[in-house]
Amino acid sequence: MQTNYHMSVLVHEQAKKYGDREMLIYQDFGGKEWKSLSWYQVSQTVKQVSNALLNLGVKVQENIGIFSQNSVQYIECDFGAWGIRAVTIPFYATSSEQQIQFMVNDAKIRYLFVGEQDQYDKARRIFSLCPTLERIIVFDPMVHISTHDPNAVYFSDFLKLGENLPRQTEVDKLQQ
């Protein structure tokens, strides 16, 4: 028996099957120690991302930028965005300011996820040149967000918008 799932549903189906079994082993930004996440943990964070994006008003087929090296948060954003049928636009972690500006404007990106300090700094410098860009969401909690930057938040604060999965019914409908 073959069951076809939308990509966004796969992580949740695997979480039902494997629960607390290890899914990912990773190092935090700049970290030296290895950590792991279970299928259940990743599934829950992906749901929070989907809910948070809906709370920000992200629509079906809207573009969301990810300007980061590979990370757990990158994966969670990909699956979370796909869960509401949004499109993730990947940026090279080494993209120049001109490249970022072009991609943000061309794709009409409102929300740009960034990884580390260098990526945040570049995104902040081009922010005013990108009329559609509303918010920079920073994965690495060690990044220094300027006190003069009301348009940037940490990923952990972004996730609070999806805490308790307030819009999960809508997310589930979008995944059918």
Predicted regions and their residues:
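Short, flexible hinge/linker loops that cap or flank conserved catalytic cores
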Residues: K16, V58, N105, Q175-Q176
